[in-house]
Structure formats: structure tokens, C-alpha cells
Amino acid sequence: MDRIEGQIEERGHWGSKAEFLLAVAGNVIGLGNVWRFPYLCYKYGGGAFLIPYLVFVVTCGVPLFLLETSMGQYTQEGGITCWHRLCPLAEGIGYAGQLILLYSCMYYIVILSWALFYLISSFSSQLPWASCDNTWNTDDCVNLAAKNLTLNRTTLINSTPAATEFWERRVLSLSGGIEEIGRINWEILLCLIAMWVICYFCIWKGVKSTGKVVYFTATFPYVMLLVLLIRGLTLPGALQGIVFYLYPEPARLFDPQVWLEAGAQILFSYSVSVGTLTVLASYNKYNNNCYRDSLWLCVLNSCTSLVAGFAVFSVLGFMAQEQGIPIAEVAESGPGLAFIAYPQAVAMMPLPQLWAVCFFIMIILLGLDTQFVSMEAVTTSVMDLFPMILRREGRREIFILLFCLTCFLGQFIMVTEGGIYVFQLFDYYACNGACVLFLSVFESLVMGWIFGAERMFDIIEDMTKSRPNYIFMLCWKYLTPLVSVVSFVCSMVEYTPLTFNRWYVYPDWAYALGWLLALSSIVLVPGWALGQLFAGKGSLKQRWRHLCSPDPELPLTCKQRAEMKETTFTAEMEDLVRANID
């Protein structure tokens, strides 16, 4: 038996504090900071959008960020087993979070394959999205980057920009709908394979390899962002774009959709409620100051989003001025910004290949560490569930390889002609804000009331030697669950079915599939709790008490040790007094 146990590998720790900080920064600072936050800010009231954004930062983002990093550092466990040790009744939250991460791993890397294809295309003598002389172009194609081009509104309505045709007809080979899956796009498939190979070798040795890779993947995007920011601010029309980005519209604050979008952006941008932060913090040493780390990482995340907006809208302002049209007509979000609007703007600049290469390197690196850290979170959580089987020499590498192959085969359909429609289903339903909001409600309720916010405060104080601000206790017990519940209900009330390009309506079976993906994670939370209650032994009250009790093997805080000594001393004194009386 001793010989078998001796073969189990140590879980390990980060090589340095910098590795942890860079890994978390690389995970939480991703594509959403560049292509989602700036667009939301302009669309929902400019500078006024920062008010609901900051409200959600204070009530949900930072409190949950601190809570999850503290949970991981205290238990030294992954996203599932940490719940088993803190509150077995809530273990379904861990399973649900890992399922959402699994869905994310399956579709998020497709974006990186598109970006890699654009990066390779950027090395051509003429950018392929900057001309209408290619085999994929139609008679309606118009090259907006052409010099001395005279445009009017009628021309724009009746034509298709070259960048749009490159995206839809060359990269996606877009079919007529999800019913028409069509052929495999072999070039995108090869790019996808390349990205999976890179991600595999980034995490195959665990934190030993991840901790070294993030020194590059988490820092170099900032170099690219700075370069693009300086270039954008020096373009004509940049000021117009920035004013459009931040001009406040206070009236929009009365629109519930503005608050919903702000809440969803915070939850995704901060990567809370899905277990990623718990896993990353679990590789810290017990006495790391996770309280200070969490505050600074949250500040870095939000500041990056704000600065990225200047880089994006300065370029969109330039493009609008060059075309002589309002910025609202060129502003895009998501893939539309990264693969149509920005490449189109780059094509209008001097040295377009240089700026295209810089932009797509930044996009790839921003998404890369988000992808491989999510993979690390899932694999670590599963390995912590089965340490006797998976934590043996050579088995981690095999398990990660099988995980990559499973995700790759599952996403194969996304690189077909109808793949973008499946991609949108995953993005809109499987990983949507409502699922994460649902988890955040129960996470804060369980840790605030069942495990105990006061106990969590003692744990953080014991680990960091500093007691958190009292506002965090108020958030965990009241504000975070209240805000999350209201946002979840509103998101259900305000639900609108998914469409593609504002014209394609999915068939009913596709919507049913989307809801199945969304509910697959949500039902795990109550389903696990009810299953454990029914499967347990004893009375219902005994089962409830057992499932709400933390693992007695968890580390004791200084306060708990002092209380135990006092209890032991009191008991010994009582025994001594009783013995003397006898």
C-alpha cells in the first residue's frame, strides 16, 4: 500500500507569486475586454454606463473574486472538491461551473483559429480583405479602403464591404442556416489543430509549464495594446471616436437592459462563479495575501477594459471619418469588431500589414491564456476528484491529451460551412450570463449563510494577517445574492431568441437545443442537493446538518486553535475539580 501511495505525485504550487498573478490576469483579461466592454459602453450610455458597471464591480465582481480565491487557497482543492470540503450540499455548484467551462473550451478556441487565419493572411503583399478582385468576391463588393472612393448611403446599403465578404465567404464559407452544415473548411481546421497543440503544451506539465508560459502570454498583449493605442490616437478622427465612446447619456440609466449588460460583463470579465479562480488560487501557499491580490487584479481588469475602449474607438472614429458616415454605422461588438470593423479600418492605414499583424497577435494572446487556463481549471478539478488514478507519473499528460481530443471532436461541426450557427448557440445559451448569475446566487448564499461569512472572514484573516473590509460580509450575505437574483429574473423576462446577422431566425429545434445547453448546468445545482438529501442516511434534519458541515480535516485558523485550547483547558480543569471532590 505504501508503495502505491508513493507513486502519487504532489499537487504542487506556483513557482512564485508573479506566476499566480500573471495566470489570473491572463485568464480574466481576455477578448471581452477588447471587443465587448467598449461596445457596451458606447451603446448603453457612454460614460453613464460606468455607473451600473461600478455598482456591479462593488456588489458582485470584487466580493465573488475574493471569495473564490480565498476558497481555493484555503482548501488547496479544485473547483469541485473544494465545495465537497466546505459544504457538500453545494457540490453541484462546482459541477455546474466545470460544465460551463467545458462548453467554453469547446467554442472559445474556434475564435483563436479564425484569428490565426487572419494573422497568416496579414503577411500577404495585399491584405485579402482590402480588395474586390478575389475569387470569393461578388459583384456587390465595394472596397472601402480604395483611394478617391466616393460613397453615398444608397451605395453602402446596396453593396457589401470587402472585409465582410472575406469574413463571410472566405473564412466562414457561410451557409444558409444551421440546417445546411456543408463542407469542412480545411484551412480553419488546420488553424484549430495548431491552437489545440499550443494549448496542450502550455498546460501539459501543470503549473510548472503554465506558470512559465504566462510570463509571455499575459504581458505581451499589453505591449500590442499600447502600440495600437498610440497609433489609434494619432489618426485623424480619433477624438470624434473617443467622444462617441464616452459621451454620457444619463437617461439610459433607467433602461433595465443597461444594468443587465453591466452585470453580465462583470461576471464574464472577472471569471467568477465557474471555479477558475478557485483552481488557480489552490496552487498558492496558505499564507499568500489573496486579499490584496484580488483587489489589485480587479482594478487591473477594469482599467484594461477602459483603455482598450480608447484603442478601439479611436480607430473606429478614423474609419468613420474616412468613409464620411456616422460612427454608429461602423461600431461593432464581438467577432464583428475583431474580424470585420477593425481589419477594415487597418486596411485604410499606411503600412496596413504591420497593424494587422499587431492586432491579431494581440487577439490570439488575449484569448490563448483564457483558453488554456480554463483547460487547466477543468483538468485540475477532475484530477482532484480522482487523485489515486490521475495523479500518477505520465497520466496527467495522457488525460489532458484525451480532454483536448474530446473537445476537438465535439467542436468539429464548428469549422463547417454552417459552423458559425452552432458557435452562436454555444455562445448565447451554454455560456450565457443567466447561467453564471444563477451560480453566483447560490455561491454567495451558501458561503454567506451556511458556511458562514464570519468564518470566511476569520479564514482570510488567518491566511493574510489582515481582516477584509466589512462591506464584503454585507455583499456575501445580502447584496451579491440580491443583485444576482434580480439580474437573473430580469434576464429571463427580457429574453429574446437568438438571431444571426439580424436576419436569420433559427428553427425551433435549435432553440430547444440551446435551452438544453443552458439548463444542463443550471439543474445540476438543485439536482445535486436534492439527490444527496434523498440518498443520505438518518432523518432529514441529520442529513441536512451533515451535508452543511465542512470537512473537519480543513486547516484550523488561529482563532479556532485558541478556542480549542480554551475548551480543552476548561474541560481539564473541570475534570481536575471533579477528581478533587471525589
Enumerate the language-model features and the residues they cover.
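Transmembrane helix-loop boundary segments of multi-pass membrane transporters
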Residues: 38-54, 76, 85-88, 208-217, ...
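Extracellular/lumenal N-termini and interhelical loops of multi-pass eukaryotic membrane proteins
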Residues: 109-180, 237-252, 319-344, 438-441, ...
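Hydrophobic, membrane-embedded alpha-helices of multi-pass small-molecule transporters
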Residues: 22-32, 104, 109, 153-172, ...
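Transmembrane helix-boundary motif of multi-pass solute transporters/channels
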Residues: 2, 16-55, 66, 203-209, ...
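Membrane-embedded translocation segments of transport machinery
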Residues: 1-16, 207, 211-375, 379-412, ...
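Membrane-interface "cap" regions at the ends of multi-pass membrane proteins
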Residues: 1-35, 64-69, 79, 83, ...
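A generic transmembrane alpha-helix motif of multi-pass inner-membrane proteins
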Residues: 108, 412-414, 424-447, 468-582
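Flexible loop linkers connecting adjacent transmembrane helices
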Residues: 2-3, 36-51, 64-95, 118-136, ...
